[in-house]
Amino acid sequence: MSPISQKGEAVCLSVRVQPRSSKSGVAGMYGEQLKICLKSAPVDNAANKECCELLAKALGVPRSSVSVMKGASSRSKVLKVEGVTPAAVREALVGMLGDEAEAGA
């Protein structure tokens, strides 16, 4: 199963976040989820904001196009990305992660 799915016009991305990491970035796959490390602590929505900003930058979409659909207070989240196709998200992930992303896609 892939961490990428489509819901209407938007793409949904299943992620697992690790707050309070030494650096922020996409770290690879965590089972069927994309693992994202964040410097921010999970306080006052800071980690969710950083997660959306990081993913928007990685996918080349505006920050307003990425939002938390499920799991706002959990490490496992579903992010909604508007204005991009599942194929474009998959291509961006393969560019960041290489073979590991292809195995999960």
Swiss-Prot record:
It holds the Pfam family DUF167. Disulfide bonds: none annotated. SMART domains: DUF167. InterPro entries: DUF167, YggU-like_sf. It comes from the Bacteria. Coiled coil: none annotated. GO terms for cellular component: cytoplasm. PANTHER family: UPF0235 PROTEIN C15ORF40 (PTHR13420:SF7). Belongs to the UPF0235 family. This is UPF0235 protein CT1832.
